[in-house]
Amino acid sequence: MLEQCDFMELTKEVLQQCKGFTCKDEDITEFFTQDYADYAYQLLGKSYCFVKPDTSEIVCAFTVANSSVKVDSLPSNLRNKLNRKIPNAKRRPQYPAVLVGQLAVSDLFSGHHVGDELLDFIAPKPNGRIKNLAIFINPYSAVVPRVYTPRQKGV
């Protein structure tokens, strides 16, 4: 579905053109309709959205920020997996990462696997636009329904 949408920075003008944004969670709706601008101004994160061009509806929105992975704070199996890819001479105590601070799918598009497509778009790719080693998703609730793994194209 996202391939048929326009990718753009979330701005006041976009929200006005699209007649706003709503999702199942009031706090996240408030973030993407009001608070996102303060986060961008304070350099805490940048918000983006996908807009359906034929209807001018915001399909989904997300906020990303620069972060890092502190290797010593990882469980040994993850630490080994991360370090295994890096030559000894270039290993560091922390590595750059992307933090997904907010992520939401519009109520209008809920149940269409848009969240999966969005995570595939954001996730690091070996030769893609994001050169970081890791992506963090800050779960809103204490219960995370499943672990995200990028889907293979064509599968």
List each language-model region with its residue ranges:
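A short, internal acetyl-CoA/4′-phosphopantetheine-binding micro-motif in the GNAT/acyltransferase core
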Residues: 101-111
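Conserved acyl-donor/pantetheine-binding loop and adjacent beta-alpha core of acyl/acetyltransferases
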Residues: 63-102
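Conserved beta-hairpin
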Residues: 43-62, 77
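Short hydrophobic/aromatic beta-strand element in the GNAT-like acyltransferase core
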Residues: 45-49, 61, 97, 102, ...
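Conserved acetyl-CoA-binding loop-helix of GNAT-fold acetyltransferases
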Residues: 111-124
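Short amphipathic alpha-helix that is part of the acyltransferase structural core
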Residues: 1-42, 47
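Conserved active-site alpha-helix within GNAT-family acetyltransferase domains
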Residues: 131-133, 139-155
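A generic secondary-structure signal
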Residues: 35-38, 121-129
